[in-house]
Amino acid sequence: MRDSLGPFRTFTLLTVGLLLSLCVIKTVKHRRRYHRLPTPPHSMLLGNLGVVLAEILASPEGFFHLFCVENIRRKYNMPSVFYLDLWPILPSIMVVAEPAVAKHMTQVQPLQRERFSPNLFSPLLTAEFILAMEQKNWKKENPALNAALTSTRVNEATSLLAPSLHSLRSRLHSISQSGKQYPIKDLLISYIIEVGGVIQLGGSFDLLAETSALDPIIKRSLDMMGWNPVKRYIYSKEIKQRTDCLNKVLVETIQNTAQTGESGKMSQSPIYLAHYCYLFLHKHPDCLREMREEHDRVFSPDRTQTWELLQKEPHRINSLHFTLAVVKETLRLIGVGGAFICHLAMGRRADLFPDPDAFRPHRFLPGANPSIPADSFRPFEKGHLSCPGQNLALKSLVLLLLTTSREFDLVPVFPKGAPQAAEYLGGKGYPEFHIGPHVNKGMPVMVHTRVDA
């Protein structure tokens, strides 16, 4: 009896064989492109996927994936520009930790900017969100955003922040009196968004009030962002059920803004940076002491006089050079940026920043010797695609430290036996994946009110 499936079987085998041959040819052709390029150990079968996967598996739970790139650079002693062949799972990338190359890519002959997928931020934010915006629209919107977020504009609006800063102090006092551990991430998120709302919209969302109705909605929204489909589904249903509350507050704020003549757009600030400022200052009490002395000197040892001066002479914030240096040094050590221009790797190069793993804010003081090499410190990027919210981000963090550092001690209390990364990445306070790298577990702290405050 003749096999009626014989021709079909033959055709199937030939088709499969042809497809496999094409895959092999394409793989070999692609891998050969990296044969003479600087890469970590590279195989014809997996490219650099094996190296990256091994690094991810060796990292603690929830580790922020971009920091694996710096670990790979160190482990294999890679040059300041190297390649990661991640095809076909991910796009292959060129990792840049060289200031001159970064300048060329962003200022001399600007390349297409990295664009975040709007799906990462939905349903809270749409494709019009600034990180998901097309380059042509970014170019159109960026000048207006920069004009609304100048250092002068931020200084002028500082006096409006007094009620919010008082609410922040009250919350910290309540946490201190409770004697309980508290994930400081929650309060810092509220603070950053509150400051952005006051400075850019001229109105408060009352996020720092203990009875805020809007605060838990925003927290849920931020927790929802990411790639976990189950968490996104669960939280998205909850968010959609309560958007009427959020929309009402925003509409009222925008209407009030229109009536008072204020304008601006909410920008994304590096919330993660506040966590690490506290973490590094706790680990370096000498820097904390020097920063407190600067606050006494520039403003007043008396808290009441400090508040009065802050409202009457907000330009004094510009004289907090060491406090700003603390913020910048934290940005250098925990810089994020993209996978192409790797700010973290650039900030950890010993030839650019002597003793690169040490927390040394003095390197950013005016007149510091050696000075910061040109184009090597670029946490907000440069050129026409730079972050428009950098003045707001820096000033809001300086204000945060001025408001809290002399009155409170925030002591991290990570669980005993908690996983940890390399010490140069924070140890138990390693960067955990979120929109940005937040301190692991939301940085649980004990808040102590200082006796001499």
UniProtKB/Swiss-Prot annotation:
Q: Which organism is it from?
A: Penicillium crustosum (Blue mold fungus)
Q: Which cofactor does it need?
A: heme
Q: Which Pfam families match?
A: p450
Protein role:
Cytochrome P450 monooxygenase; part of the gene cluster that mediates the biosynthesis of the indole diterpenes penitrems. The geranylgeranyl diphosphate (GGPP) synthase penG catalyzes the first step in penitrem biosynthesis via conversion of farnesyl pyrophosphate and isopentyl pyrophosphate into geranylgeranyl pyrophosphate (GGPP). Condensation of indole-3-glycerol phosphate with GGPP by the prenyl transferase penC then forms 3-geranylgeranylindole (3-GGI).
Q: What general EC class does the enzyme of this chain belong to?
A: oxidoreductase
Q: Which family does it belong to?
A: Belongs to the cytochrome P450 family.
Task: Give the location in the cell.
Answer: Membrane
Key words of the record: Heme, Iron, Membrane, Metal-binding, Monooxygenase, Oxidoreductase, Transmembrane, Transmembrane helix
Spell out the protein name for this chain: Cytochrome P450 monooxygenase PC-20
